[in-house]
Amino acid sequence: MVTVKFKYKGEEKEVDTSKIKKVWRVGKMISFTYDEGGGKTGRGAVSEKDAPKELLQMLEKQKK
């Protein structure tokens, strides 16, 4: 399992790619939503160059 490390509101976070629900591109950033548990949805973003290949593959799959 691959984890994505990112900063959100100044806080370092990481999330497993299996929890990511939706992925989209905003300029040179890859944004995503993920399941935080307890019915909560979290948001995050990572630069395209720092994104793991699994996250980029998820982005390509959602485009189709």
From Swiss-Prot:
UniProt keyword annotations, A-Z: Cytoplasm, DNA-binding, Methylation
Listed GO CC annotations: cytoplasm
Residue positions where N6-methyllysine is found in the record: 5, 7
Classification via Pfam families: 7kD_DNA_binding
PTM annotation, UniProt: Lys-5 and Lys-7 may be methylated.
Record carries keyword DNA-binding: yes
Influence of temperature on activity: Hyperthermostable.
GO molecular function, one term: RNA endonuclease activity
Localization, UniProt: Cytoplasm
Record-linked InterPro entries: Chromo-like_dom_sf (IPR016197), DNA-bd_7a-e_arc (IPR003212)
Subunit structure comment from the entry: Monomer.
Function text: Can constrain negative DNA supercoils. May be involved in maintaining the integrity of the genome at high temperature.
Protein known as: DNA-binding protein 7b
Species whose genome carries this gene: Saccharolobus shibatae (strain ATCC 51178 / DSM 5389 / JCM 8931 / NBRC 15437 / B12) (Sulfolobus shibatae)
